[in-house]
Amino acid sequence: MKKAFTLFEIVVVIIVIGIMAAFVAPKFSRDDLRLAADQIAAHIRYTQHLAMIDDKYDPGNAYWYKKRWIFEFTNINTQKKIKGVCENTNCWRYNVYSDESGSTNLNSIDQAAKDPENSSKRLTAGFSPGSLTKDALKKLNLKLNLTYTYNINTIEFRNGCQASRNNVGIKIRFDELGRPYNGNPDIPYGQWFVNEIGKVSPCTITLTHKNGSTCTINVEPETGYVTIKDCDKY
């Protein structure tokens, strides 16, 4: 005759499993801050890769260098009331694009890089509302909207990449050798990463989650090497 579990034994097992799950479950909770940092670092590296395989040099165009590939942080209001596409000025997002028009801004969905993980999407979460056609809206990538997707409330830029006025964002451009530049260049090779006293320094990007935890991303001058450090656990 086979022995069977009693009802009491089954209840005890269920209780033990429940207690174990209560301790284990938090370890599997989503870490928005680290996910955002990993994604940003990967896309900065991807921008550098695009710049190195897409040399923009053109002897017939004196402003050829303005077309280089750009990684751009911004929190400027798009004035387009679309769910998840920056409905207010405290909505951080970023774009990866080649400034083909030389306007210093992303003006067309076709200028944005294709998402290497999903070719139907572009590496932008929104830009000038006048350019957001129905086709463009389908290609927007909400994972690049850091506030909406990852609950990132603020981003600070220090050392080699001081933000523009009002801290509305920065631009990191890469040349054909993968070297990073800060902002909108006036010459082909200039505007290195330098701090307030003119010393060459890494670009330091600090993300702050809505719960107050922070994570820092560094982009090194000359090499463009990207590292993540000092990520708080929560």
Residue ranges of model-derived segments:
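N-terminal single-pass transmembrane signal-anchor helix
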Residues: 1-32
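Exposed loop/turn and edge beta-strand positions of beta-sandwich/beta-sheet ligand-binding modules
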Residues: 10, 65-67, 168
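Membrane-proximal N-terminal amphipathic helix
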Residues: 32-65
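Terminal alpha-helical segments
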Residues: 34, 56, 92-99, 213-215
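Short, glycine/small-hydrophobic-rich surface segments
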Residues: 54-96
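Intrinsically disordered, low-complexity regions enriched in Pro/Ser/Thr/Gly and acidic residues
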Residues: 97-221, 227-229, 233-234
